[in-house]
Amino acid sequence: MAVSRTLRELAEYLGGTVAGDESKTISGVASLDDAADHQITFLANPRYAPKVATTGAGAVVLPPGGERHGRNAIHVANPYLAFAKLLTLFHVAPRKPQGVMEGALVGHNVAMGSDVTIYPGAFVGDGVTLGDRVTIFPGVVIYEGVTLGSDVTLHSNVVVYQGCRIGNRVTIHAGTIIGSDGFGYAPDGDGFYKIPQLGIVVIEDDVEVGANTTIDRAALAATRIGRGTKIDNLVMIAHNCVIGENCTIVSQVGISGSTKLGRRVTLAGQVGVAGHLEIGDNSMVGAKSGIPGNIPAGSMVSGIPAFNHRDWLRASAVVPKLPELRKTIAELEKRVRELEEKQGA
């Protein structure tokens, strides 16, 4: 059944104030370009402000003092957050629990909470614990002794290795591997001796992990992902790493073993982090950067190797001019030699 709300109701839901017709009914969310009269849109980036005047939306979510150009509007402190909440209200329908469906394989001594759904083709090993409202999609493999909290969703082809622990309200997207062996080998003459990886992975509450990401199990204790952290697709987190709370790790990041991230650290796309390092709280690392050493709390760094972001911007501005500068330096060197030859004559 479609959801519809008046602007007055939406303003109460979002903690905002209405400008215009409070009784206007809204039944969906769309972009500034595509919205129709029954839909609400939002403005979070000032560069798109001119589109407020031309949008076909029935209402616009704006920041405080934002120009509404005669449109119905809801003013809120954080339009982007409001947009997310509106999408949840209008377009995210809760799934009805299906129980253990035919074709699912469930082992012995599995403890299940209420309203669990296990789709056909999923495998749940012996001694697994599933909290309330867990959803396990086709192709998921859960090894023995795993613990999942409540409101956990594992999308198709996720694999969770033995003994790993996943908290409440965690979503893991398709193809991700939790708890595979860490990359540990001891040199043995001309070859290598595999170091058994006996630890686990612990994923705390409110974490989301994207598709095709790998988080390796620790050698002895736990690789840990802190509460509220968001991890994108195609990320590699090696054994023994500890990721702090509310971190953001963007696609194609690689974090080597035993590295620790503090709280609220952001690693942009394709960052590479060496092993046995510490990155302090509230630090930000620019895309494609290489981290060879520790990063103090509150830092903003970029580059290979990474250094202060502002200095990196200045250095990057010089790079396109290097051929011209090289030519200029060569000419200056030639003139200096000529002057020296004249003085010595």
From Swiss-Prot:
Origin superkingdom: Bacteria
GO MF terms, alphabetically ordered: N-acyltransferase activity
Alphabetical keyword list: Acyltransferase, Lipid A biosynthesis, Lipid biosynthesis, Lipid metabolism, Repeat, Transferase
UniProt catalytic activity: a UDP-3-O-[(3R)-3-hydroxyacyl]-alpha-D-glucosamine + a (3R)-hydroxyacyl-[ACP] = a UDP-2-N,3-O-bis[(3R)-3-hydroxyacyl]-alpha-D-glucosamine + holo-[ACP] + H(+)
Biological processes per GO annotation: lipid A biosynthetic process
Residue ranges crossing the lipid bilayer per the database entry: none
Family matches, as Pfam families: Hexapep, Hexapep_2, LpxD
PROSITE patterns: HEXAPEP_TRANSFERASES (PS00101)
Sequence similarity: Belongs to the transferase hexapeptide repeat family. LpxD subfamily.
Protein task: Catalyzes the N-acylation of UDP-3-O-acylglucosamine using 3-hydroxyacyl-ACP as the acyl donor. Is involved in the biosynthesis of lipid A, a phosphorylated glycolipid that anchors the lipopolysaccharide to the outer membrane of the cell.
Record-given protein name: UDP-3-O-acylglucosamine N-acyltransferase
